[in-house]
Amino acid sequence: MSDENKQPHPMSQRFRGFLPVVVDVETAGFNPERDALLEIAAVMLTMDEDGWLRRGETHVQQIDPFEGANLEQSALDFTGIDPWNPEREAVPEREGLSEIFSPIRKAVKEHDCKRAVLVGHNATFDHNFVFAAALRADIKRNPFHPFSTFDTATLAGLAYGHTVLAQACKLAGIPFSNKEAHSAAYDAEKTADLFCGIVNRWRELGGFPPPPIEIAEEPQE
């Protein structure tokens, strides 16, 4: 098939030309400019020819704390991450983010999208850490939209009446292990399953494509 006759990927028609990519970060605190980024996972999403959203491959990087980074002990206790454990095989922020961003840029092109949009559970947290790290690492080609995100905490509150990831997953019929939680890969994959489930359920219910709606005219005074 020639490029002229090639049909655009269905994903490019679903989210205004954006490719949703699910991201979870594990950190040494809550301040993206001061506290260390320790782990990042990105889960790719795709859409089949029938328009159903599916989870794809997962990319994970362990990250070395940047020079001068703050490490809150309470955050380390919560995640169970030892930043100095050599078995982590951690890499500097620039190398780790480059390894995460590269397949995302490739997927954006393959899905005929114009850029990626970050999906996360409480997405602002992940978005802020990704962008702060990219700025420190002087990475110019950040594939993510600079401010738009899809937040599964908000979507789950609408769909299931619960904003906690573990509880929302259980209500959605997605198995969730508290023992495996707080690993970037595990949390990102569960968030991806939750996001796909909500988007697909909305489609099943007839919410997308949106039905024609007659726009009422403003009353004339």
Curated annotation (Swiss-Prot):
Keywords: Exonuclease, Hydrolase, Magnesium, Metal-binding, Nuclease, tRNA processing
Residues the record marks as site: Important for substrate binding and specificity: 30, 78, 125, 147
Cofactor binding, note field: Binds two Mg(2+) per subunit. The active form of the enzyme binds two Mg(2+) ions in its active site. The first Mg(2+) forms only one salt bridge with the protein.
Organism: Marinobacter nauticus (strain ATCC 700491 / DSM 11845 / VT8) (Marinobacter aquaeolei)
An example molecular function term from Gene Ontology annotations: 3'-5' exonuclease activity
Protein name per Swiss-Prot or TrEMBL: Ribonuclease T
EC number: 3.1.13.-
Active site, UniProt feature: 182 (proton donor/acceptor)
Keyword tRNA processing: yes
All copies of domain Exonuclease, residue ranges: 21-195
Binding residues for Mg(2+) 1: 24
Positions that bind Mg(2+) 2: 24, 26, 182, 187
Subunit text: Homodimer.
GO BP annotations listed: DNA replication proofreading; tRNA processing
GO CC annotation terms, alphabetical: cytosol
Source organism phylogeny: Bacteria, Pseudomonadati, Pseudomonadota, Gammaproteobacteria, Pseudomonadales
Top EC class, one word: hydrolase
Cofactors demanded by this protein: Mg(2+)
